[in-house]
Structures are given as C-alpha cells and as structure tokens.
Amino acid sequence: MDQIRIKGLEIFAHHGVYPEEKEKGQHFFLDAVLYTDTRRAGLTDRLELSTDYGEVCRLMNEVMCAQTYDLIERAAEQTAQEVLLAFPLIRRLELELHKPEAPIPLPFGDVSVRIERGWHRAFVAFGSNMGDKEYYLEKGLKELKEHPLCRPVKVSKVYRTTPYGGVEQEDFLNGVMELETLLTPFELLEKLQQVERQAGRERKVHWGPRTLDLDLLLYDDCVIDTETLTVPHPDMQNRDFVLAPLCEIAPFVSHPFTGKTAKQMLEELKHNGEKHVVDTAQNKLD
C-alpha cells in the first residue's frame, strides 16, 4: 500500500510520570507513516481524494496537547487512534513518539515508543431463539454499530434456522455482520460477550437456547488458538446457518486454514452436511 511519511513533527507537551514533567513540559517529536491508496489523488490532482497531511499534523499536535499522560505509550496510542478515526482513507499507520528530554540520569540520544495500528476486517455471526428474537438481534447489532472503534460494513438478511447440536428448543434467527474495527480480536470478543450479557445471555446448556449469541468468525486472516478465543470459528464450516448469510455478504472471503471461500464451503455442506436453514424471508435488520 502507498505511504505518506511525516518525520520530526515537533510538539511541546506535558507528559511524564514526574510532577516537574507535567509542570514544565518538554519537546516531543512524532514520526508517522500513513498507509493509504494515493492512486486516485495521483491521477486527478484533487486534494479531496487524498489525505491532507497538514491536517494530520494539526490533529496529532492537538491530541498530544489536549491531555496529560504519564506514559508516552498512552500518548502514542491515543494519537494513533484519533488519526485513524478522523481520516477514513488511512487504513493503517506506524507512529513513533520520541522523548529526547526524558529524565534519564545518564548520557543518551533518544527514547521512543513505536506502534502500528490499523483497521481490521471482522465477521460476526449473530443469533437468537428466546423471547423477542428480532429485538435482541437489533439491540445487539446496534451496540456494535455504535461502538466508537467499530464501523459496520454489511449485515446479511435474517435466516430462520432449526437448532444445531441436538438440543430440543425453538428455531433460531441467524445472520452475519461484517465490520471494520480498531479493536484487537480479544477486545472484540470481550465486547461481544458484554453485549450478550446485557441481553441476558446465560450459558447453562451447551448449544442450548439463548437470547443473543454473538460469535467471532473471522478476523483478517488471523489464526488464534487460546483458552478464551479460537479464530477462525472452529465449527463455521459445518454450519449452513453461518455460511449462508456469510456467503450473502462476502462469498469470496476465505478460510485461513483451508483457503476455501465461503461459497465453496457452503456448496460442500449442501452435499455432505446437515441442513438447518429453513428460509430467508426476513428482511435485513436496521
């Protein structure tokens, strides 16, 4: 991806652990690499199709001076986040914050922290089979759409499906949402579980009924296997109620292990697997 580079932006701010750092202030320097597509701006010479690096510098200075932080890690994190939120053409950035006047009682050239942050593509499956199912789904998706570090991309239709896993219970309403997020996979999982709890989700029976179920299916092409999170979702290839809505909004997204697309996995499941999708008569959720 193309880059816009900013080097040595000088900012006077009041960050540091010691009281004198907060009181007197000191000079900080910022380097930034902005990852963006400059093609259209390069062909048309139109500023609105580019990222105004002057405005980026102004915003970084504003964020650095707006609050006082103990750690340069915190100052760098906040600065990177605000830039990514304010400039939609920037997909990713590298930011290095230098603190050359740090209170170190030995000769040194510089102290800095360097971070990389960016937007990530995630797919979340949603489902409900208790109470007012549409209400729970609408409320859950609304929570995700309104999260400051998430941007909704697409939401599938709602599919009526039979239960999966052998537990006798009511039919489900299921679908899939694509979003872009600045959250890490673990932060996104924490948010999904929080939204489930707010909807009264109780984990009493494995594959049992639930007011709201939110599963992280895919996160970029990441492969994660921990006690708390497995990505890609370990059973997604066996669930037509996941693959059908996923195929509707992103038929060519691929599984990181097998390389198979959602469309290919759904076709295989139609011939060899269980069928749970009953109909797709429901409209998309607002």
Locate the predicted segments by residue.
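Flexible, gly/pro- and Lys/Arg-enriched active-site loops
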Residues: 37-42, 119-121, 164-171, 183, ...
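Short, surface-exposed acidic-centric catalytic microdomains
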Residues: 42-54, 146-184
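Short amphipathic alpha-helices in soluble, non-transmembrane regions
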Residues: 139-144, 188-195
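N-terminal, polar/charged subdomain of small-to-medium soluble alpha/beta proteins
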Residues: 1-124, 128
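A short, local hydrophobic-aromatic micro-motif
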Residues: 7, 91, 151-156, 244
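N-terminal beta1-alpha1 ligand-phosphate binding loop
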Residues: 119-150, 156-160
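Short loop/turn motifs enriched for small/polar and acidic residues
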Residues: 96-100, 158-160, 217-219
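Hydrophobic C-terminal alpha-helix "anchor/cap" residues
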Residues: 79, 83-84, 144-145, 192
